[in-house]
Amino acid sequence: MRVLPATLLVGAATAATPAQQVLGGLQDFGNAVQDAMHENLPKINKPLEAFQEQLKSLYEAREFWEEVANAFPQNLDHNPVFSLPKKHTRRPDSHWDHIVRGADVQSVWVTGENGEKEREIEGKLEAYDLRIKKTDPSSLGIDPDVKQYTGYLDDNENDKHLFYWFFESRNDPKNDPVVLWLNGGPGCSSLTGLFMELGPSSIDENIKPVYNPYAWNSNASVIFLDQPVNVGYSYSGSTVSDTVAAGKDVYALLTLFFKQFPEYAEQDFHIAGESYAGHYIPVFTSEILSHQKRNINLKSVLIGNGLTDGLTQYEYYRPMACGEGGYPAVLDESSCRSMDNALGRCQSMIESCYNSESAWVCVPASIYCNNALLAPYQRTGQNVYDVRGKCEDESNLCYKGMGYVSEYLNKPEVRAAVGAEVDGYDSCNFDINRNFLFHGDWMKPYHRLVPGILEQIPVLIYAGDADFICNWLGNKAWTEALEWPGHKEFAAAPMEDLKIVDNEHTGKKIGQIKTHGNFTFMRLYGGGHMVPMDQPEASLEFFNRWLGGEWF
């Protein structure tokens, strides 16, 4: 059905005009009409202006879709993906050592400063439960001297069940901070971060755990969370297709965990993650900070090689692919020119997405920009996560090690030891990835939340300088472009050498750093998309120093 704009505008104006009243004479009637029109004109114009903006956005969206359909028809062969629920068997309550009921937490009332009754902890937690089991490390051979907990956060109202794995600090758990780790995707399990990057063990080609001396739980307790639902060991009868929907789940998990373990709640708490966590972390952090009455002692956030501000970051795919990021060019001159030519249109689409935040605009922006600026690199067969080498295993995001992790976590004895309720494990769920893309989440301007976060806590953006897909050039650029009170000083701050200071390699240059106020950017030499995997010593160095408060 097609409706002309003029018809709609006239109809709206007519509907907004007040009903006529019976007056004493024609002159009075005319004056009354003029007065009524004058009085109500702003009321008429405001919805008309809003409606005109909506029409403009719709026309623009139609143009975008037609352009994308003509240029990349293969990318529109998509229907919303409603994944079949994972096969699972819920364990009886008797299996778990603790079950923390959100309703019980919400039932605790205290007397506030004004003398009125208020909830001890804010948030809508009634539908949530947290199941907790102390895991026997000796049965897995993973950090056998470290206390571990596994379990599920249950959203009983929406049939969502998020799996987590907690490792206590190897050092001083009574005083060391607590960190939540999130992998990206969207749709990839944080257990890949555990076993490929920063956890207490890696998995070798024999599918056996190998001790990691550079694990991030060397001086911090770490929680690895499989989110959103239907990722890793998590499962649900429903689906999640945008970042905001997952924020309340994370707040509930942390609140109930710290309620059960107040000894950890007393410690400093930090959120860290990589890749699409550049979307997750600003949203999750804002959700936590929005609650004044909370038991989460949030002190800072860390985002590694993240996607946070697409408008700025997509500009740096061409430079990184064409030899301007510190490594040899991957693409030839013709491909580089093609990317240059496509950039302007890509950015105009992203700007429209930022203005409307509508899926109708944001989806074609993602499709166009990814095909124009990412696909030329992907077609070379080079690893998008590391410009220094080829993609060695396309079925496992270029890394054979990811296949080892999946094989290990699919072992029945491993699933039994950690209390997993699903019948199988996949490192990444690509249905979720597509759903996030086709709901417009990929290009949304979540970087706009960062200034509000900086008002309250420090933020570290770090980037391995060999990554292509979330490269250091783009991450440095968006941090320097971000509008916040310290913008000018941060942008003008020089990049200084980052050196090891506390081991036998003292003085070794591991990267560059710039900082002002609560904002810090780091470039890590020789790190790809997964810095802790590529540069374990350097990553533990900056991680420990960041948690120690050296730069804030």
From Swiss-Prot:
It is an enzyme of class 3 (hydrolase). Disulfide bonds join 188-428, 322-336, 346-369, 353-362, 391-398. Keywords: Carboxypeptidase, Disulfide bond, Glycoprotein, Hydrolase, Protease, Signal, Vacuole, Zymogen. The keyword Disulfide bond applies. Vacuolar carboxypeptidase involved in degradation of small peptides. Digests preferentially peptides containing an aliphatic or hydrophobic residue in P1' position, as well as methionine, leucine or phenylalanine in P1 position of ester substrate. Its main location: other. InterPro entries: AB_hydrolase_fold, Peptidase_S10, Propeptide_carboxypepY, Ser_caboxypep_ser_AS. It catalyses: Release of a C-terminal amino acid with broad specificity. Residues 18-133 form a propeptide. GO terms for biological process: proteolysis. The lineage of its organism: Eukaryota, Fungi, Dikarya, Ascomycota, Pezizomycotina. The keyword Transmembrane helix does not apply. This is Carboxypeptidase Y homolog A. Glycans are attached at residues 219, 518.
